[in-house]
């Protein structure tokens, strides 16, 4: 979602790899614990995105954009030698290194939401929420399937990630086998679920 905001456009396609390496056998999980996805944008820009959920591993969230003259990071622009060309000089309320030492963006989101509620003013982030989520679905579908995915084709595909009528009695879309293990998406054979019913 940061790349979508930075580029002011949505990805056209994605391809990637992923897997389940560290989740404990028998732990209720049918999802990968790591993904590496390359997103392609209409202007020719390519974004490499990686994530992982490894206990005891490095825990950080950051973005870095590389251009012809250097790097753009949250709160700072440097050239290839590391010389700072620009640095955010505004308030520094966050102690997080991942936020570049600047105001924590997650706190800003909460502040804006709370202010809108208190002042009874509209705050509509539905478009950003929907396009951000769908960009993640695009990347995950690419890693699960092992095949390149196109944004518009996936958006138009006949599938549903949620049952039409979800109740406490609904059968989950993924259930464990007799040993308690959940099936994992397998590249080359994974297919999105068609419309599900409860």
What would you call each of these model-derived segments?
Residues 1-198:
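Contiguous beta-strand/loop segments that form the cofactor/metal-binding neighborhood of enzyme cores
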């Amino acid at each position: 979602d940061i790349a979508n905001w930075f580029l002011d456009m949505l990805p056209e396609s994605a391809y990637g790899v992923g897997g389940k390496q560290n989740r404990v056998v028998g732990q209720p999980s049918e999802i990968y614990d790591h993904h590496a996805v390359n997103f392609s944008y209409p202007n020719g820009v390519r974004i490499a995105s990686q994530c992982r959920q490894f206990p005891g591993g490095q825990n950080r969230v950051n973005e870095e954009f590389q251009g012809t003259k250097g790097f753009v990071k949250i709160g700072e622009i440097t050239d290839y030698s590391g010389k700072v060309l620009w640095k955010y000089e505004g308030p520094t309320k966050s102690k997080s290194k991942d936020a570049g030492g600047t105001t924590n963006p997650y706190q800003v989101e909460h502040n804006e939401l709370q202010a809108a509620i208190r002042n009874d003013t509209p705050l509509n982030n539905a478009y950003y929420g929907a396009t951000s989520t769908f960009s993640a679905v695009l990347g995950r579908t690419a890693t699960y399937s092992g095949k390149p995915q196109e944004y518009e084709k996936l958006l138009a595909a006949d599938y549903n990630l949620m049952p039409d009528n979800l109740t406490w009695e609904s059968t989950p879309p993924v259930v464990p086998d007799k040993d308690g293990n959940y099936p994992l998406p397998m590249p080359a054979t994974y297919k999105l679920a068609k419309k599900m019913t409860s």
